[in-house]
Amino acid sequence: MLRLYHSALSPFCRKVRLCLAEKRLEAELVEEKYWEKSSDFARRNPAGKVPILRIEGKALTESMAICEYLEDLHPDPELIPKAPEERYEVRRLVGWFDDKFHQEVTSKLLYERVIKKISGQGFPDSKNVKEGARSIKFHISYMEWLLERRRWLAGEDMSLADFAAAAHFSALDYISDVDWTRSHVVKDWYAKIKSRPAFRSILADQVSGFPPPLHYNDLDF
């Protein structure tokens, strides 16, 4: 069986988990306290990051590289299109959420509100929290613009771009940091994607000391 070293609220780990589940690949989940920087963890990935996927004796790192590896091995269902323009758009949007959105929103809200506390790094920086809360409004507007022109974020079919975005939004939704009233279009998109069977384990996540809001695992929120 595959083994995934992960952190429950990490959007990068969630993206890989969604990819695995959508392709019906079973994996043992091993919670990794990456901030403790244990010697075993350092041997698994000297970069000191999760996720790490153990497969056929190899330790795969970097979430996008893992997802592309899984796509090559298990192309059905397709999450990264083969047509160059469509493939580009999926990769562009995965990059958007994993780089720009993470830097401007997820890292400021999730890190400050949760990671700092569970890793013993002190109290939230209110300036960062305010910046993250302000920045997410722009990103929701951009997503609304995309979704008014397409069925899914990158085109007419659901793709890894949707999973990348949903991985970030689900982590933020766990800590009640998404104002779903800002866009019914984005809310409908999220309700649609969280209803997929691949999302079940994500919605079952529990982080000690941080209970999710009641709507977190409600498919009709």
Residue ranges, per PLM feature:
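Acidic/histidine-enriched, glycine/proline-rich intrinsically disordered or flexible terminal extensions
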Residues: Q206-F221
